[in-house]
Amino acid sequence: MVQNDVHTNLFCARLKVIWDVEEVVTRRTIVLACDHAGFPLKRSLQGFLAGQDFGICDLGTNSNESVDYPDFGFAMARALEDGRAETGLLVCGSGIGISIAANRYVQVRAALVHDALGARMSRLHNDANVI
């Protein structure tokens, strides 16, 4: 979990490289969802993405209060299913549980990534629609 500004800024810079590729992003709306452990990073990502002219569909959570991560992974899947967006970002403490929850849905191809190269390759070569 990235919690300080230096790491958050680095993450946002890497995210910009990943999502700047025109053929990678076909729509400009990105769905964001997180559990309580991911809330601080999600809040930073919202500001960054808004500054890059992305539309944001925020599915929560909106506080540090403890919540069940599967609820937010499932909400992401439903948002992709009903067409609110084609891509999304999930954030939790490790990324593992929320990715597993989202991947239960046929239309979700969530990849757990740790760096810009992994994220970029997941999008370009594996057609991941959620990172």
Locate the predicted segments by residue.
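Glycine-rich phosphate/diphosphate-binding loop of Rossmann-like nucleotide-binding domains
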Residues: 31-50
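Compact, glycine-rich, soluble single-domain proteins
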Residues: 90-108
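C-terminal binding/interaction regions
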Residues: 37, 116-131
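A short beta-strand-loop structural module common to alpha/beta enzyme folds
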Residues: 55-66
